[in-house]
Design a protein with these regions (language model features):
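Short secondary-structure boundary segments
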Residues: 1-12, 45-47, 51-52, 95
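C-terminal interaction-tip segments
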Residues: 1-12, 102-125
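Long, hydrophobic N-terminal alpha-helical segment
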Residues: 2-41
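Coiled-coil-like amphipathic alpha-helices with heptad-repeat character
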Residues: 14, 89-92, 117
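Surface-exposed ligand/attachment interfaces on beta-rich extracellular proteins
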Residues: 17-31, 44-69, 76-83, 106-107
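Noncatalytic modules at the cell exterior or secretory-pathway interfaces
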Residues: 34-39, 89-107
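Generic structural motif
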Residues: 52, 98, 112-114
Length: 125
């Protein structure tokens, strides 16, 4: 058996916290990686509707738009308690931001976070 530790990197986008409002994650630069997977990790959901999505841009600070379904390997659904979801990104933009859109005016919401797993580094140490 072989370890993937040296072959993969994890870039945190959304810190795991209790969510009662929409959150847009930190920008993730994909310049040095040929493979990227967005991972949403929900904990206990008490109320509200929490929908994950992936946005992309050519610029680090602006111009983010929703990733087209054709540029995702897989699909995302409304988050449920303790059910992680992931999609591969096969688009051509350099930057990603993960988003959890919250509706329904939750009182306590959802404990959730998200990250991007990156592999196939273009720069091997």
């Amino acid at each position: 058996m072989k370890s993937l530790r040296a072959l993969l990197t994890t870039a945190l986008s959304i810190l795991t916290l209790q969510r009662t409002a929409t959150v847009t994650g930190a920008t993730v630069d994909m310049a040095n990686f040929a493979s990227n997977k967005a991972v949403f990790v929900p904990g206990v959901l008490t109320d509200g509707v929490h929908t994950p999505s992936v946005t992309e841009s050519d610029a680090a600070a602006s111009g983010f738009t929703a990733v087209a379904a054709a540029d995702l390997d897989g699909a995302l659904a409304v988050l449920a308690s303790n059910v992680p979801q992931s999609v591969g990104y096969i688009g051509s933009k350099r930057y990603l931001r993960l988003v959890i859109t919250t509706t329904g005016g939750p009182a306590t919401g959802l404990n959730a976070g998200a990250h991007v797993e990156q592999g196939n580094s273009r720069k091997i140490p």
